[in-house]
Amino acid sequence: MATVSSCLLRRSRTASRIFKTSLRCFSTTSSSAQTVSGSSPFPFTGTNIKTNVSQLIGRTPLVYLSKISEGSGAYIAVKQEMMQPTASVKDRPALAMIEDAEKKGLISPGKTVLIEPTSGNMGISMAFMAAMKGYKMVLTMPSYTSMERRVVMRAFGADLILTDPDKGMGGTVKKANQLLDSTPDGFMLQQFNNPANTQVHFETTGPEIWEDTQGKVDIFVMGIGSGGTVSGVGRYLKSQNPNVKIYGVEPAESNILNGGKPGPHLITGNGVGFKPEILDMDVMDAVLEVKSDDAVKMARQLALQEGLLVGISSGANTIAALDLAKRPENKGKLIVTIHPSFGERYLSSALFKELREEAENMQPVPVE
């Protein structure tokens, strides 16, 4: 039975200092009797039946954008992380951070209350893992995020607290810390500070890209939220080939990594308004800026031209990749990016505003 492969670092719940580093890996194992959590040993050994849903995480495919990149001069391949169990790249770090804390004895199902600030997808992935493992989950989230996110989190049994949209992710983090201080047996995985968030991409996402491209990737470009993906993948690819270029992506309206100021934008999950502790600025060759409107338009274009129904951050990543593909120095190169989430999660957002209104106004036709 395959499991996600990851080597993780131990971190204190309250201190930002890493006080102990321990290497451990999820690995593919087989035994005479696979045990399903909370049940008797699984008797059907040798079958391709997974013993729990977490074993579905990882090994997402790369797809070439033949139409979008046509005439650009370079080749763009996109890793479809929307094909994870909860349709999001965040399934990887959610699993890694929870299992890392469990192995260190920091949390235990039925006792620990997990508390986490989120802009949406990480919260869904954590709620999914908490439901599977038996944890109570409390999430704080800015109220500007989509209705779909709220419903999915609640469907997994998580408690959800919405925060003032004008305070951005900073306000969401502050509220989560307040809840942590007042909750007995509360524990925060701290996605913005937890090195397991980065390391899981170093140990899984990066190697998958390297293997699937047979080491031919020239450029990797990725939107920056917590910074875990771009940092982990970037480190791995550069460890294999120092000449690989790594680019981050942030909203033009909230371009703090390029010296600007935080501000409202539509690229949910990116541009959190502060520099996360785990973000490795040194691994990136540059941070590109993408306007929200352009990201929305590209996400719509991907559905119509490539048959890929993706979210707004996927549109932003594709815009950035296309910009790089058009540069003369990148002619003939292979550019890899990621589609972090599935578009159906954005039905109530600006991405589908016109189509939603059109659908709402549809009238039935008579049938003779």
UniProtKB/Swiss-Prot annotation:
Residues given in the record as pyridoxal 5'-phosphate binding sites: 121, 225-229, 313
Reaction(s) catalysed (UniProt annotation): O-acetyl-L-serine + hydrogen sulfide = L-cysteine + acetate; hydrogen cyanide + L-cysteine = 3-cyano-L-alanine + hydrogen sulfide + H(+)
Transit peptide: 1-27
InterPro entries the UniProt entry points to: Cys_synth (IPR005856), Cys_Synth/Cystath_Beta-Synth (IPR050214), CysK (IPR005859), P-phosphate_BS (IPR001216), TrpB-like_PALP (IPR001926), TrpB-like_PALP_sf (IPR036052)
Tissues expressed in: Expressed in green and etiolated seedlings.
Record has Methyltransferase as a keyword: no
Protein's name in the database: Bifunctional L-3-cyanoalanine synthase/cysteine synthase, mitochondrial
Lineage start: Eukaryota, Viridiplantae, Streptophyta, Embryophyta, Tracheophyta
